[in-house]
Structure formats: structure tokens, C-alpha cells
């Protein structure tokens, strides 16, 4: 039975405004979650508008299925496959906007049974879709110490990655960890210097979650796919919550806004330059949550919204 965990959508109005909704447009909410963005998009669409929502979390799908609206459809799957979903519906190049709200949601964090949080004891799972792939416990029990250390360093920016990885492997040899509390305790014991403002397991849990769900690869693939999916003038509106996510989004928008880089002085005809193509996107800037939103929803503090528009190139 699914409990009703509270979820406050971050940068709700700003992210939807970033799509520049047309009443008859076709939009994608790639991270349905609990439907905050989707419901606002639907409220701005006319009868001819359409909204395609995507989520890989079965609990999110259950919520989406309660929306009885002929303009709305939900897909159970990763947003990295959005180009396939669009192609199946013969909508390639016709999408007027894509919204992505990256990372883990409040209901996922707050539900101990999902295994995302070191603050609540539950099964050491961390999968966005619990029906697919390895759980965090399974991966930590089979991975090499060097691989665990690399994940903690790369995706958690954990300075004590090697020490923590060694402690995890040693603990799993004695008795395999299956609970979030066990992992949090092992990490805390292996961390020689504590940050008084942050739990010692914060970075480890983030890193393992990102790895288990292939989160950064998912983002990169979705961004790449957006170029073929969006119509000219179509918008990308993307919310990220930590520097690794935001770095990928920022770099993609910057690179696609530049167009092909030609070395200075290289002799090229006008026809050759045209063949290289122009800018794919026009970056429209970024927004951060205001003081009022952060006060009402502390989890919004680290969020960044970046918006870009597909060019006619």
C-alpha cells in the first residue's frame, strides 16, 4: 500500500513559465513525480494541447493514473528513452517543451521502505524503479573495493572515499548489509573528520544512489535526445539539485548555444560552414529559488533552474 507522503514541487511556476506554454502545444514532463508540474501545465493547455508524462517510479505511475484527462498520458520508463517514446507517437521534432526535475523526490526520501535516506532505517535499495536492476545492497555486496571508492569519489565527491569503501567491503565480508541504518553507521565510523552541518553518510548515499540509477547517464542521454525531439522554438526547462547534475546541464546548454567551433584562420567556403550547421539551442539563463520558497521548503535551497530554446538551425 502506498503511503501519502507530502511533496512540495520546487520552482513550480518558474519551471512551467520557462516552457512558454502554447495552448495547442505538445509538452513532455519527463519526471512526473507527484504531478505538480504536470497539473500546472495541463491547466494552461487548451483542448488541442497534449502532455506526455514519464516516470520510472511505480508509485508515481499510480498517482498519474488518477489523472482523468484526454490530453494527458503517462509512460512507465526512464526519461532517457524520451526520443523512442516520441518516435512511437510520430511526434519527433514536434515537441514544444520538455521539463525535467532531476534527482530524488521528497516522497522517495521520506519513505523508509525505498531505502534512499540515511535518516530513516529501511531496506538498502535506492532504486527509482524497484522492479529493475540491482539494489544498493546487492551492488555493494558484489562490487570491488576500488570500484566502490571510485563511485564515492566521482558521484559523491567524498574525500574519504577509499577509507569508506574499505570499511564497506570489510563489513559485508563479516555480515552483508541489508539496511540503510547499517550503511550509515559504517560510513560514520569510517569518517575521521565530521562536518557539523552535514551527516557523514550524505555523500555516500548520494553517490550510491546516482550509480544504482545511472542518473548522470540518464540526464546526458535525455539532453542529447532533446535536440531531435524539440520543434523550432521548443523549450528545455530543467531543475537540478546538486553540482554534478547542474554541471552536465550547464555544459550541454553552453555547447549547443555556441554552434560548431572552427579554428581561426581555417579556410572554409560559405557552403562548408553552412554544412556544419548553426547553434542548436539558445540559452535563456538560470533561476534560483527565492528566500520565501527556501524558508517554506528547505530542500529547494540547492535547486537551479536552467532554460534554453531550440533554434531553427
Curated annotation (Swiss-Prot):
GO term, biological process aspect, one: rRNA base methylation
Compartments, record wording: Cytoplasm
This enzyme's EC code(s): 2.1.1.199
Enzyme class (EC, first level): transferase
Chief location of this protein within or outside the cell: cytoplasm
Molecular function in Gene Ontology: rRNA (cytosine-N4-)-methyltransferase activity
Positions of transmembrane segments: none
One Pfam family here: Methyltransf_5
UniProt keyword list: Cytoplasm, Methyltransferase, rRNA processing, S-adenosyl-L-methionine, Transferase
Name the UniProt record assigns to this protein: Ribosomal RNA small subunit methyltransferase H
Species of provenance: Salmonella typhimurium (strain LT2 / SGSC1412 / ATCC 700720)
Lineage of the organism: Bacteria, Pseudomonadati, Pseudomonadota, Gammaproteobacteria, Enterobacterales
Amino acid at each position: 500500500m502506498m503511503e501519502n507522503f507530502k511533496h512540495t514541487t520546487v520552482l513550480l511556476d518558474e519551471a512551467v513559465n520557462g516552457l512558454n506554454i502554447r495552448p495547442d502545444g505538445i509538452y513532455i514532463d519527463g519526471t512526473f513525480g507527484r504531478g505538480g508540474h504536470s497539473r500546472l501545465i495541463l491547466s494552461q493547455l487548451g483542448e488541442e494541447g497534449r502532455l506526455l508524462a514519464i516516470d520510472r517510479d511505480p508509485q508515481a505511475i499510480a498517482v498519474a493514473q488518477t489523472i482523468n484527462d484526454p490530453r494527458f498520458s503517462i509512460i512507465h520508463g526512464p526519461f532517457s528513452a524520451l526520443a523512442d517514446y516520441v518516435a512511437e507517437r510520430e511526434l519527433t521534432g514536434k515537441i514544444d517543451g520538455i521539463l525535467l526535475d532531476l534527482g530524488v523526490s521528497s516522497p522517495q526520501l521520506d519513505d523508509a521502505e525505498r531505502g534512499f535516506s540515511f535518516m530513516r532505517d529501511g531496506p538498502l535499495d535506492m532504486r527509482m524503479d524497484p522492479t529493475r536492476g540491482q539494489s544498493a545492497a546487492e551492488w555493494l555486496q558484489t562490487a570491488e573495493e576500488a570500484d566502490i571508492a571510485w563511485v564515492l569519489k566521482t558521484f559523491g565527491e567524498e574525500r574519504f572515499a577509499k577509507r569508506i569503501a574499505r570499511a564497506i567491503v570489510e563489513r559485508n565480508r563479516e555480515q552483508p548489509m541489508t539496511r540503510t541504518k547499517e550503511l550509515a553507521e559504517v560510513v560514520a565510523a569510517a569518517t575521521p573528520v565530521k562536518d557539523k552541518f552535514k551527516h557523514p553518510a550524505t555523500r555516500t548515499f548520494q553517490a550510491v544512489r546516482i550509480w544504482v540509477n545511472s542518473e548522470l547517464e540518464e540526464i546526458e542521454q535525455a539532453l542529447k535526445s532533446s535536440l531531435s525531439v524539440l520543434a523550432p522554438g521548443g523549450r528545455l526547462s530543467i531543475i537540478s539539485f546538486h553540482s554534478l547534475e547542474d554541471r552536465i546541464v550547464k555544459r550541454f546548454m553552453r555547447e549547443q548555444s555556441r554552434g560548431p567551433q572552427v579554428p581561426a584562420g581555417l579556410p572554409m567556403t560559405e557552403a562548408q560552414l553552412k554544412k556544419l550547421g548553426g547553434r542548436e539551442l539558445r540559452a535563456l539563463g538560470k533561476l534560483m529559488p527565492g528566500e520565501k520558497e527556501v524558508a517554506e521548503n528547505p530542500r529547494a535551497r540547492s535547486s537551479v533552474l536552467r532554460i534554453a530554446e531550440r533554434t531553427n538551425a
